[in-house]
């Protein structure tokens, strides 16, 4: 029987549309930077932002690889093997997640401005609000979560997301009251499908993987990641799902059908 329900966020419980390519976003963000003495042209800021994301991600990846080798006496990381498997899939071994406030700190520094972390966080939140066209729950989400709670199931969030804005979006949608514990990737330095992210949740919350299920809309991050962690997985094929074939899911639900999902998780299907 399912006792622990582990949910993805965006595309699973939350419908969101962001457009970071909108020129108006960068025009307004450049104006915001200028308030603090960091002058950028909009397109220049956009390019500098993309470059910093790539640079910081690659630097963090290399740091993680060096740390893993050191912990294993110079040998490749062998901690994240699949339960019962003797081989590894390298593409899953390193899925680093940087903290976006570091990107904005660097962008200020490039213009000679020593911004503090608070300003960097607020800049990131402003950027997110500029680029978000809508943010809403899928129909029936709270009814479904309430039904799970009423029968005593544990509810967890495991999301590839940036804490500086996702934590606030969760509060704005009044979702935080439903979760026993929330895990956002930027707080842990790795993201799905990295086995370390799944293991962090399972170990921290002392979850029996035999009675737990992952629910998500991404075949690689959610479904394959869950399977590698020894979890059952339910795939929601929603408007935000990548174009993909999902063969490993234990169950597939077309659309964000919370009625069907509720029945499935309660053992009524």
Task: Name every feature range the model reports, one short phrase each.
Residues 8:
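Walker B catalytic carboxylates
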Residues 27, 98-102, 164, 196:
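A generic alpha-helix surface/boundary motif
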Residues 1-5, 15-19, 36, 43, ...:
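Asp-based, Mg2+/Mn2+-dependent phosphohydrolase catalytic module
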Residues 90, 126-135:
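Surface-exposed cleft-lining segments at the edges of enzyme active sites
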Residues 20-33:
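Basic, amphipathic juxtamembrane/active-site segments
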Residues 30, 40-125:
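A metal-dependent, Asp-based hydrolase signature
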Residues 137-141:
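A short, well-structured juxtamembrane/interface segment
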């Amino acid at each position: 029987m399912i006792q622990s329900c582990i949910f993805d966020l965006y595309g699973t419980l939350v419908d969101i549309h962001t457009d970071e390519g909108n020129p108006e976003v960068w025009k307004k963000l450049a104006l915001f930077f200028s308030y603090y003495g960091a002058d950028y042209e909009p397109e220049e800021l956009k390019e500098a932002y993309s470059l910093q994301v790539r640079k910081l991600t690659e630097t963090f990846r290399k740091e993680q690889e060096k740390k893993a080798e050191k912990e294993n006496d110079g040998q490749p990381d062998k901690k994240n093997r699949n339960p019962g498997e003797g081989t590894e899939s390298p593409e899953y071994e390193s899925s680093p997640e940087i903290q976006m406030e570091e990107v904005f700190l660097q962008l200020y520094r490039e213009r000679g401005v020593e911004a503090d972390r608070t300003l960097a966080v607020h800049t990131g939140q402003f950027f997110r609000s500029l680029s978000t066209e809508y943010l809403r729950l899928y129909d029936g989400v709270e009814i479904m979560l309430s039904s799970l709670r009423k029968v005593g199931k544990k509810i967890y969030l495991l999301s590839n997301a940036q804490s500086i804005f996702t934590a606030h979006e969760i509060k704005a949608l009044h979702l935080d009251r439903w979760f026993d514990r929330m895990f956002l990737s930027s707080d842990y330095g790795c993201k799905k499908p990295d086995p370390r992210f799944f293991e962090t949740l399972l170990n921290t919350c002392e979850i029996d993987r035999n009675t737990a299920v992952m629910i998500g809309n991404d075949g690689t991050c959610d479904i394959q990641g869950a399977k590698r962690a020894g979890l059952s997985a339910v795939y929601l094929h929603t408007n935000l799902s990548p174009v993909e074939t999902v063969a490993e899911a234990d169950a597939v639900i077309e659309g964000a059908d919370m009625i069907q999902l509720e029945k499935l998780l309660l053992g009524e299907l």
